[in-house]
Amino acid sequence: EYRRQRQMCIRDRNMPLAYHHHMGTIIETEEDTSRLIENTKDTVKLLVDTGHMLFAQGDSIKLVENFYDRIIHVHCKDIRKDILEQSLKNDATFRQAFLDGAFTVPGDGCIDYIPFLNALKKKNYSGWLVVEAEQDPAKANPFEYAKIGFNYLSKTAKQCGFEIIN
């Protein structure tokens, strides 16, 4: 009954439902995400998270190319490559990798956002690009890192032809 009520609420308000692939959940990898999208109705949309996709050793650009019509939201998160590699080598849990500082904001990690943003622009994406990073605030000042991420993503998105509205 609860599920039916939520579905009606979403439908009545014309709110799209987006699935967020995420480490530590049932849908983590590029393959998991593809299977989900291929086996659900078009009403189920997709939130692409660049950091979680790279952590799962997947390709966010392929998600854009294959499922653009389902993408309605993007989380731009970066990865500290050395910590990710160490976490994978040690078969660390997602939680441990997070605590070790694997994630950071765009511009402070190893993701080259130009090809990703160009893929979105090529498909005329006009939704949100959200700066995000799961970090320990005692190690990474949230305000300072938010500025780093916003400045980098704004500059890079403009280079790729996006109009930035803040």
Where in the sequence are the language-model features?
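Basic- and aromatic-lined ligand-binding clefts that recognize polyanionic substrates
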Residues: R13-T40
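Short N-terminal helix-initiation segments at or just after the protein's N-terminus
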Residues: N14-L17, K45-L46, L54
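Catalytic P-loop NTPase motifs of RecA-like helicase/translocase cores
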Residues: T25, M53-L54
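Active-site glycine-centered loops adjacent to acidic/histidine catalytic or metal-binding residues
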Residues: D49
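Single conserved hydrophobic/aromatic residue that forms the stacking wall/gate
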Residues: E1-I10
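Alpha-helical and His/Cys-centered functional microenvironments
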Residues: C9, G24, I79
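Surface-exposed cleft-lining segments at the edges of enzyme active sites
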Residues: R3-R4, A18-G24, F103-T104
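Histidine-acidic metal/acid-base catalytic patches
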Residues: E30-V44, L54-N166
